[in-house]
């Protein structure tokens, strides 16, 4: 049912219906129509309640956990509406692995007659957006009279008459964006052909030699690119495009990964030898290792270690020399974000100043099996292949070549070394435009954890080290990095031990005479798996780990008991392991505090970028930016444009863009403008009270009712398809109650 909290816009109609001039003029959104400030219209059934104690309304100081909104922007609501309390903090695990969480499908059954509104809608559906009758591919992209016979002939279930399709089976053209197809406008041609929802802007009727009128698609050669299907090379501004043949070879187990296979065999062989030698020594030998009375114990111990190491099989090959990396204060990082971290969103963040980006987390096994959806995660926009901006006056890293660097990296996770190694070798060959390959050891989602991936690797440090060492060996010039959490349990943080192992190498590595695993960077999320997002990130612990990393990097004798100097190819390419902090970064103050006070090289921004993508702009300028409602709406429009370019402007592409735009709005609606806050800095953990904006559009953008998000999407994508569905990720946004009695 409709919520009593729905924002009402005076004389407003959805895009495509009468009265759209309130939103648009000549197809463009007119944010100026929202200059007057109007409150949310809330039905008051009882006496108003105002229980928020902040400095703004007479309270003393800043109330912990509640956003300090100025008194004049607070809304007094009745007890019957149930809105007096601040909104609950949403479970943001989905920002790390939403689609894998949705696959889990678990969840206890709801008891009682009122549905529980907390938690997540695990089994979400989005309906289908498609034409009433689809156009056959043999005519979808060609002039009306093109001689392209259909192999199915009269038995084909799709339409072949273009005029009939346009008149009867395709919805009317959209009049947003001035009625001009954003894809055609950007690229000079539209890959959606006759199925485009803006096809009227790039079609024409011409007269043929025999006097007939023929419909044709129009292209603008001056703006067209020349796409190529060469593996991994740019196609219409997108890189890392994997061919169908390669994915099919993977699916049929015909794709060869010789390096991964031989290295996996070596890992298995050496692991058995190490296990036998480490745990099979007799007690007398073990007792004699520390030393003896004549002081010759150290020499004897080294001789014994040298003899032991001679028993082990040498690795089949050593890692290739890696591309030099740099992480610093001028390179804020956009975290890997499943679902939300899609190509259009990353492209938007790069526009706003993000210097480094990551793909959504991909499952190694799915990559090895040739999954189309998983390999699609490797695609990146051409803007992500540009070098990150660095300070040219500063000596950064020896032999660092900024011109060879790029912004985009990929993140994977896996539960077995052979899977991770095969995925890494395939990615190295098929996706050349990668800055790094990052191993996710922090994903808290139950399904991922139960498979032994994600944060489960934190409790299996030896296996993780083998995986990273092997990935480093097969990844060519692409460096390997790792993202971890404090540990799996609140009471037992293990990150310090794990960091020491990853930088120095574990006991097994020293047993066989090998050095560290060769990771180029480590990112620490300042929470445990058990904690999830329930409390603030522990930057004190991150600071301790940063000091540890600095100390280990400064050690000249890596591995105090090693016999030989470690091979340079086992070492980080930059001569040091970079250390990144992650957690609750929501402003430029948080960012620079992390670098200056906690000692990290740079900060990885996750939810802060989801709520306000211009956080990167704030970091670059070193100040808060009080974005107006019209400026924020312009970012929504830009996301819609980028979405149509990425997913297409046909019915399916518009539906897909709408779905991800609504996911985007499910985070951005949490933003409270800094201009209406009593205190700064804002905290991402603060729950917002009921508030109104400085004008009606600002109020609309802050609505937590998903029906208002759909209204916003219709400003740019027109009315939703009749079969389109959107279920908010968080049940608290759904406003749906099971009727009683």
Curated annotation (Swiss-Prot):
GO biological process: mRNA processing
ZnF segments: C3H1-type: 130-163, 180-205
GO molecular function annotation: flavin adenine dinucleotide binding; mRNA dihydrouridine synthase activity; RNA binding; tRNA-dihydrouridine47 synthase activity; zinc ion binding
Cofactors required: FMN
EC number of the protein: 1.3.1.89, 1.3.1.-
Residues at the active site: 443 (proton donor)
Catalysed conversion reaction: 5,6-dihydrouridine(47) in tRNA + NAD(+) = uridine(47) in tRNA + NADH + H(+); 5,6-dihydrouridine(47) in tRNA + NADP(+) = uridine(47) in tRNA + NADPH + H(+); a 5,6-dihydrouridine in mRNA + NAD(+) = a uridine in mRNA + NADH + H(+); a 5,6-dihydrouridine in mRNA + NADP(+) = a uridine in mRNA + NADPH + H(+)
Comp. bias regions, Polar residues: 1-20
Biased composition annotated in UniProt, kind: Basic and acidic residues: 96-106, 300-309
PANTHER family from the UniProt entry: TRNA-DIHYDROURIDINE(47) SYNTHASE [NAD(P)(+)]-LIKE
Name under which the protein is recorded: tRNA-dihydrouridine(47) synthase [NAD(P)(+)]
Organism ancestry: Eukaryota, Fungi, Dikarya, Ascomycota, Pezizomycotina
